[in-house]
């Protein structure tokens, strides 16, 4: 009965306006009130502030600053084995396994379309048919920055407008095609392990989705699909990210879906639905053996990457002033 009521609310509540209101409130500097809200949040969700670069809740000017707080480097060591891909986010694995032609497992007994997830881009979908997927859910208590599982060269980004259903076990079991319906940002990379997609999925109260190369992707929510492309390799304007490097973040939010090409990686055997994930821990292993490369891709420069988009670059956390 209670679950039925919760599901009904998903269709009745004005999710877009709730999300806009949450985003507005989370970005406001309210002094003691901001600190009170953060303290209550930390207590309720049992957030481990000892991992944060700034453990004192009074050091955050807005709730958003707290929510995307950077962690101390040593608390998330990155597996350095060149054959290992690492977890991109702190959270819990919702589902993982093989992509069956066009079908991805959403929950037990419920599948959704790979092509629909990729906004009908059948050429991109062809890269991942019969490949491997991992869906990672980020709870409110988790660190909400998303990192690279491996070295990658950004080739394409697609913003897909959509619904803002909550993402949790209940909705995954009961809202058909949940991840293919919600707002999302699709990022396609060239990697040593073949093409890889890393998809940031929005949800109710997700104030924004951002990337390190383009800043805020949403809002604004204009209701149209947007697409950006970047050159390959070391060409001018290319964007290279290193294994373990931050690639994006949620301001309140949600879910990361990784897609890997067929025959390229094997997921770590111990992983299963509801496995806890920590950035930098092993996620998958290459089906081929790599030696440590003599050189790595040049990391993303500190200055804004020049690309044709309307987004703003992210602020360097280490340069933030309290």
Curated annotation (Swiss-Prot):
Q: List the disulfide bonds.
A: none
Which residues does the record list as Pyruvic acid (Ser) (modified residue)? 254
Enzyme class label = lyase
Keywords, A to Z, come to: Cell membrane, Decarboxylase, Lipid biosynthesis, Lipid metabolism, Lyase, Membrane, Phospholipid biosynthesis, Phospholipid metabolism, Pyruvate, Zymogen
Query: How many and how are cofactors bound here?
Result: Binds 1 pyruvoyl group covalently per subunit.
Q: Quaternary arrangement and interactors, per the entry? A: Heterodimer of a large membrane-associated beta subunit and a small pyruvoyl-containing alpha subunit.
What is the name of this protein? Phosphatidylserine decarboxylase proenzyme
What species is given as this protein's source? Escherichia fergusonii (strain ATCC 35469 / DSM 13698 / CCUG 18766 / IAM 14443 / JCM 21226 / LMG 7866 / NBRC 102419 / NCTC 12128 / CDC 0568-73)
């Amino acid at each position: 009965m209670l679950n039925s009521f919760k599901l009904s609310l998903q269709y009745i509540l004005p999710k877009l306006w709730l999300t806009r209101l949450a985003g507005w409130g989370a970005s406001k500097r309210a002094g003691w009130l901001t600190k009170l809200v953060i303290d209550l949040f930390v207590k309720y969700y049992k957030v481990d502030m000892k991992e944060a670069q700034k453990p004192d809740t009074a050091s955050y000017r807005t709730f958003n600053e707290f929510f995307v707080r950077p962690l101390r480097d040593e608390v998330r060591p990155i597996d350095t084995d060149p054959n290992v891909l690492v977890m991109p986010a702190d959270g819990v694995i919702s589902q993982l396994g093989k992509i069956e032609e066009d079908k991805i497992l959403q929950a037990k007994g419920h599948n959704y379309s790979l092509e629909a997830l990729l906004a009908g881009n059948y050429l991109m979908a062809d890269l991942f048919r019969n490949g491997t997927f991992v869906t990672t859910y980020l709870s409110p208590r988790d660190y909400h920055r998303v990192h690279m599982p491996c070295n990658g060269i950004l080739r394409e980004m697609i913003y897909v407008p959509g619904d803002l259903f909550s993402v949790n076990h209940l909705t995954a079991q009961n809202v058909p095609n949940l991840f293919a319906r919600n707002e999302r940002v699709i990022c396609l990379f060239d990697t040593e392990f073949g093409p890889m997609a890393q998809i940031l999925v929005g949800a109710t109260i997700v104030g924004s989705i951002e990337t390190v190369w383009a800043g805020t992707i949403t809002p604004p929510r204009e209701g149209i699909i947007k697409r950006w492309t970047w050159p390959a390799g070391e060409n001018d304007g290319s964007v290279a990210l290193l294994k373990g490097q931050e690639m994006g973040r949620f301001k309140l939010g949600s879910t990361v879906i990784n897609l890997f090409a067929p025959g390229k990686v094997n997921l770590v055997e111990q992983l299963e639905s509801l496995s806890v994930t920590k950035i930098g821990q092993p996620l998958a292993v290459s089906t081929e053996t790599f030696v440590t490369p003599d050189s790595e891709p040049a990391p993303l420069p500190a200055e804004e990457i020049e690309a044709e988009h309307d987004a703003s670059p992210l602020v360097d956390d280490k340069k933030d002033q309290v």
